[in-house]
Amino acid sequence: MGIDRRPLAIAVMGPTASGKTATAIALAKQLDGEIVSVDSALVYRHLDIGSAKPDAAERAQAPHHLLDLRDPWQTYSAAEFAADAGRVVADIVARGKTPILAGGTGLYFRALLQGLSPMPEADPVMREALSTEAAERGWAALHAELAKVDPAAAARIHATDPQRIQRALEVYRLTGTPISEWQRRPGVAPLPVRTLKLILAPRDRAVLHQRIEARFDAMLAQGFLDEVRALRAMPEMAAVTAPLDLPAVRAVGYRQAWEYLDGEGDAARFRDKAIFATRQLAKRQLTWLRGELDARWFDPHVDGERLAGAVSTFVAR
């Protein structure tokens, strides 16, 4: 087998609250690299505290890319991300640096490392119709409908993942072709890099749950609710007829905060709902990550030396 001469990239993957930001910064310093965010919440301006977006001190330690690309009332597709990330990675490589792809959005990672099928663009009218149906029937009913027209997609998409249910049904209703079929068609090519996939996750699930809870309490102390109040006060957000359908507001924590500020439940109930939703997100992320068969798993708080050794070995190849 010949030598793989493609440029090197490091993918730092993992569930929420697993330590990806700190690890990515450490690797960027070790490899003279630059960090490319692979996170669907971090593309939105004004979503800082609740998204755990790297702060000014963290950004000062290494260059960061693909943060703050859109306003919260706008949308941003996986195809747009793949195009933007492709340009950024090409520029990083051209300057002799190492791209550090860091985040927890599985669709974005698949778009980068496996390519993206040429699916139709989002249709606001269809999305609004699906949201109205969900309000009347519930997302579980729409998931059951998806299972009838696209069993393969329904098997991959959890019944509590409204954004992906909506997208799958949107594509089917617009084209008459299941999204699983679209995903098999050639489209955007994967990045022309050789990639070391690192998955960060505590060995003990209870430890991850504790970190999620502690981090959310820290976000509350930092002013997360005030951040959401400021979002709600923006004229552009106030003009949106169904703000809970916006991808930015659907982000874990933001949706629960929005509902709380709408008068749903008390502060304790809001906290419990947000922490539960974050744990469910972590569960879905771990399910996706277990399918990454060519990845290396590490507990960043235990396996620091082993992780550094794996990176050094890969780079030296």
From Swiss-Prot:
Residues 39-42, 163-167 are annotated as: Interaction with substrate tRNA. It catalyses: adenosine(37) in tRNA + dimethylallyl diphosphate = N(6)-dimethylallyladenosine(37) in tRNA + diphosphate. One of its GO terms (biological process) is tRNA modification. Its EC number is 2.5.1.75. ATP binds at residues 14-21. Its cofactor is Mg(2+). PANTHER family: TRNA DIMETHYLALLYLTRANSFERASE. Monomer. This is tRNA dimethylallyltransferase.
